[in-house]
Amino acid sequence: LRGEGGSNALDLPDVQKQGDFFVESPIILFAAVIWFLRIYKDGKYCTFPHAIELLNRRYEDVFPILTSYPELENYLSPFMDAWQGGAMEQLAGQIASAKIPLSRMISPQLYWVMSDSEFTLDINNPDEPKILCVGNNPDRQNIYGAALGLYNSRIVKLINKKGKLKSAVIIDELPTIYFKGLDNLIATARSNKVAVCLGFQDFSQLKRDYGDKEAAVVMNTVGNIFSGQVVGETAKTLSERFGKILQKRQSITINREDKSTSINTQMESLIPASKISTLTQGMFVGAVADNFNERIEQKIFHCEIVVDAEKVRREEQAYKPIPVITDFTDADGNDRMKEMIQENYNRIRAEVRQIVADELQRIQSDPELQHLLQNK
């Protein structure tokens, strides 16, 4: 993942605060850091770990370096004004807003995954198709969720194009990550042969983590819904989505003298919320969308989904082994994974220290840029 969309990692905890000063400021600062790394030596060091390490250097070093590039001068203008004007408390708040969420992602393991590129993320490339499977860790959900959201954002930009292979984006437990641009992907991906499949426990989870507006867009844009047992507002929402049907009601009145029968019609929920909230395991309700030339008469269903166990078994037997991308064993067969991951971590930190030293030396040697170091 090199130099694309890195500021999305800052969006996860603040998705409902877009436009807030202390939310936008760190995004701008981190975007400037990423842009610098793309410029510096043709992007040789433009990786997410390098960006984190550079951001965590002293701002007395980082600001002059970034400002020395005309392309980045406007990015840094608010920060330089605060620094030169002595607004140190404001400046500290802005910088901390960028450092704190990203500092949680500093780890040798994450640096290993997000540094060198073993493969490209255009998974539906006709010349080099891939299957990419990633998972979150419940113990570090917020940390890895930001990293996964960053990958998702980049993948969506690459696969949602014409002339690619058919592909699918399948996400289970969606609320555990922030997927920037998910609503747009659902709305536009179908024309580019990209299927989007989202799994989550309840609509309330989506509203909590994505905000009411974005959650509503996601819920109302999807064309196919499969649901097991859910309760509360989710059950009511699904019941309303499935619509109503005209049903007959018959009532019988009996007294001493006679017996009367009345029949009337009334619009009732096709699948009541009470029924959705009491579904047993294996029972599903849902709705499917059709195409113009492939009409589906029965779009709403309430049934048991039967799994063909024998077919699943045959499919599992035909699985191919996962290719080894990186071999952590040495010539003697010893596992050196920890050592190699730590060496990569140390290398990235050393490279950033050298970048800062070289850039400060360049600025010091340039009479037109020396003034940037006067306030250092």
Describe every region a protein language model picked out.
Residues 13, 186-188, 192-289:
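Conserved ATP-driven motor cores of ASCE-family P-loop NTPases powering translocation/secretion/packaging/pilus
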Residues 12-194, 209-210, 276-280, 288-295, ...:
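P-loop NTPase motor domains
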Residues 162-166, 198-201, 249-257, 313-321:
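A generic structural motif
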Residues 300-302:
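N-terminal charged/capping segments associated with class I S-adenosyl-L-methionine
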Residues 1-2:
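Short, low-complexity S/T/E/D/G/P-rich linear segments that nucleate or cap local secondary structure
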